Amino acid sequence: MHGIKRKQWTKELLRQKRVQDEKKIYDYRSLTENVLNMRDEKIYSIEALKKTSELLEKNPEFNAIWNYRRDIIASLASELEIPFWDKELVFVMMLLKDYPKVYWIWNHRLWVLKHYPTSSPKVWQTELAVVNKLLEQDARNYHGWHYRRIVVGNIESITNKSLDKEEFEYTTIKINNNISNYSAWHQRVQIISRMFQKGEVGNQKEYIRTEISYIINAMFTDAEDQSVWFYIKWFIKNDIVCKTLDEQEYLKMLKDLRENILLINNDEIEFSGKQNIWCLKILLVLEDILEEKEALTERSSEQYLVQLIDADPLRKNRYLHLLEQHK
């Protein structure tokens, strides 16, 4: 790192570090053996719980110890009051801050909430606020988004009220903040599907037109980001869109989208001298749909595949295979 003085490791310092490392390893192995022995002996006590805390702070990915911890808590549940459960949530949060992508921590937190002595909406609404803060720190954390869906589902179940529209707006905020947030796009897919299935969309055609405008804007914002293109591919092929729009409306949407993609690709060529790989890939998808609908006046698939061979040589064999199929 620039500006940071490199530490000079003398033989004595290396020896001291080796001694310290050996002690840490010994202590960890001793603690692990101790806790596993207590588990095997089915010791379910507060002291055993403390030992699991100590071990999980050293290794939060030790799933067997999380399982043992839950067994202890379940055994002592009748003696445990709300302050204990609050402290347990604090303990888990402390670990999540340092290890936000360890599944077992998220899993345990969910278990604690499900076994919390009261099932009031406030508990889950507070948890939603906690998830919001965690996603502010790492907006693309897959575990955080998955956990959020579970929390929202519990709030909806308790209150008997859908939060789909609020969650849709939340994805918009997150995507606007960072268009490459794949997790937010993925969440958007699920919410739109659910809203249509549950009849939560009033003017469905207008909703789709608004969404396609949002997509086009996203393409122009960052044409290199694959998250946008994955979403586009889902959107144009989804039954929700195909069945809501009539044939002419659907074809017009596809052709308008194609014109915008061609414009983006031409801008890319003018700016960098290179084709945009994602533009070419989605143009192929669009051509396949238009050809299937017998609405393709001029076929350019072979041209796009030849251009992809040049622009994306790592996948050359795939494009050659597709080129053979198109001949």
UniProtKB/Swiss-Prot annotation:
EC annotation from Swiss-Prot or TrEMBL: 2.5.1.60
Q: Where are the PFTA repeats?
A: 44-78, 84-118, 123-157, 163-197, 207-241
Name this polypeptide is given: Geranylgeranyl transferase type-2 subunit alpha
Q: What class of enzyme is it?
A: transferase
Family to which the UniProt record says this protein belongs:
Belongs to the protein prenyltransferase subunit alpha family.
Q: Which UniProt keywords apply?
A: Prenyltransferase, Repeat, Transferase
Reactions catalysed, semicolon-separated, are:
geranylgeranyl diphosphate + L-cysteinyl-[protein] = S-geranylgeranyl-L-cysteinyl-[protein] + diphosphate
Pfam families, alphabetically? PPTA (PF01239)
Report the GO terms under cellular component.
cytoplasm; cytosol; peroxisome; Rab-protein geranylgeranyltransferase complex
InterPro entries attached to this UniProt entry: Prenyl_trans_a (IPR002088)
PROSITE patterns hit by this protein: PFTA (PS51147)
- Describe its partners and assembly state: Heterodimer of an alpha and a beta subunit.
Which superkingdom is the protein from?
Answer: Eukaryota
Asked if the Swiss-Prot or TrEMBL record annotates the protein with the keyword Transit peptide, the reply is no
Q: Name one GO molecular function term.
A: Rab geranylgeranyltransferase activity
Signal sequence bounds: none
Protein's job = Catalyzes the transfer of a geranyl-geranyl moiety from geranyl-geranyl pyrophosphate to proteins having the C-terminal -XCC or -XCXC, where both cysteines may become modified. Acts on YPT1 and SEC4.
